[in-house]
Each structure stands twice: as C-alpha cells, then as structure tokens.
Amino acid sequence: MPYQQITVNVNDAVAERLADALMEHGALSAAIEDAYAGTQNEQAIFGEPGMPAEQIWQQSKVIALFGEHDEAAAIIQTATQECGLKDLAYTGETIEDQDWVRLTQSQFDPIRISDRLWITPSWHEVPEGSAVNLRLDPGLAFGTGSHPTTRLCLKWLDTQLKNGESVLDYGCGSGILTIAALKLGAGFAVGVDIDEQAVRAGKDNAAQNNVDAQFFLPDGLPQGQFDVVVANILANPLRMLGEMLAARTKQGGRIVLSGLLDEQAEELGGIYSQWFDLDPAETEEGWARLSGVKR
C-alpha cells in the first residue's frame, strides 16, 4: 500500500502546533526537521550543549505521512487553519510500501575503513576474518561508519591510538568510536551522550561486539582524565564544550574533533589552540577533523 508524504515549511512559532494538529486529524506520523538540514546553515538545537532547552529551528519542515486514501489536502487545510495559517504551500510525494527491513538491509554493506578495520552489519558475513570487524547495525543513534566524520575519527583511532590508552568518546551516538577504540587496543573506553537512546544503543552494540565499554549521560560521567578524547558532534556544541573537553584530557594527551565542515575548521582550531597544539585539519567530502596534543 502506498503512502502520501506531505512536507510543509513553517517558522518556529507554529511548527510543533502544526505537527500536533496534523496528528490529531489523521496523519499517521508527523516529524519536524531543520529546513536547512545538510547545508552550512544547519542548526544544532535539540538537547545540544549551550542551546536553550525550549527552542526549535527558526525555519522548519513538518513532514507528515498519510494513508493512500486519506484526504491529506483536507486534513492539511483544517490543521493549518487551526494554527492560524492561511494558503500555506506544501509539497507531496507518494511513498511506495515495501519490505522495509529487507530494503534497509540492502542499503548497508560492509564498510572498509582501512586495511585492518571493517564495519559489518550483523546480517552480512565478515569480509576479512583476520581484520578488526565492528558488528554494527543501523539504528536510532548516529554512527554506522557511512558518514565522513565517523570515518575520519575511525581512521585516526586506527593509526594513532596506542595500546592501553584510555579513551573518552563524547557524543558517542551508536558507540561506534568507543567500541572501535577497545577493539584497536584501548585499555579503557567510555562513551557519553545527551540522548538516553544513544546510551542504550551503545550498551547493546558493545555487547554485540563482546567489549567491556561503559556509557553514560553527561551528568553520570565519573571524574577523571583520559589519554584520548574524541568528540564527533557539531560545530556549535564543540564551541561550547572546549574548556570541558580540555579539562578531561590529560596533559600530553590527545584530542580528536569532527562533525565540523571544512570551512569551520579554522574557527574551531582557533578556539582549541588555547589548550592544544593542533595538527593541520584532515578533510573528507567537505567535512573536517582536527586533532592535537594538550600542552
């Protein structure tokens, strides 16, 4: 059975009200996204450090899903009128029903990070039995190895991590970097995320990979410093978290930062150079990674 997907661009004053109204009048689902997602103007909002707790993007997309025979246009008209909106433009497309599990699995093949490091979904055979294989399935938390920022951090761990070092993965998402660190020789690794779902996903993924990783919400992170601190998040929280991440890094320890665009590397480098001697930025597909040693 096909579905109707409707996308409406609105401002921050009405996005949540419109999503609620669409659900009340029959939408199967309604989601709110940054209208500028994937561009330089993308904003880190929900739950990001340094951002107000109650805030939404100034320009948002409300994406609603309807059944094949639902009167989507009428529902949108009713919902927009309730929200005080008139003649609101929207776009629509048909989404074909599929075997979503099989489709999802077909889109995720093993990913080769380096000669010795692979990421392999659980439904695939391990491509290189002698390699370090991370068993990781796509889920609700960010980090499957397909994004350039994740790959940049994995490549650093693969080539620079020393046996027995302690690692803090701040903004751990799926826990991929925490797990990789342990499989690559770290003596101790901790993942931290503001999202409870990510913390649960990290624990599940660590169990699947037979590694003893610990995962916490920020308030639960024990005191202490680490040999290596990795933060693969967005530029705005990286700006806000510099002093804290530096404090968590041992003197002579190293930091690895990603989640920033190419053009943001110079600015972030200026901030973190207060505490670290930084190497030149490494880039991949428009994204950057900074790394350096704490003075």
From Swiss-Prot:
Documented EC number(s): 2.1.1.-
GO biological process, one term: methylation
Sites where the protein binds S-adenosyl-L-methionine: T150, G171, D193, N232
Matching Pfam families: PrmA (PF06325)
Cystine pairings recorded for this chain: none
GO MF assignments: protein-lysine N-methyltransferase activity
SUPFAM superfamilies: S-adenosyl-L-methionine-dependent methyltransferases (SSF53335)
Chloroplast as UniProt keyword: no
Catalytic reaction(s) noted: L-lysyl-[protein] + 3 S-adenosyl-L-methionine = N(6),N(6),N(6)-trimethyl-L-lysyl-[protein] + 3 S-adenosyl-L-homocysteine + 3 H(+)
Cellular localisation: Cytoplasm
Lineage top rank: taxon: Bacteria
Gene3D superfamilies, alphabetized: Vaccinia Virus protein VP39 (3.40.50.150)
Cellular component GO terms held in the UniProt record: cytosol
Chief place of localization: cytoplasm
Family indicated by similarity: Belongs to the methyltransferase superfamily. PrmA family.
The protein's name: Ribosomal protein L11 methyltransferase
UniProt organism field: Neisseria meningitidis serogroup B (strain ATCC BAA-335 / MC58)
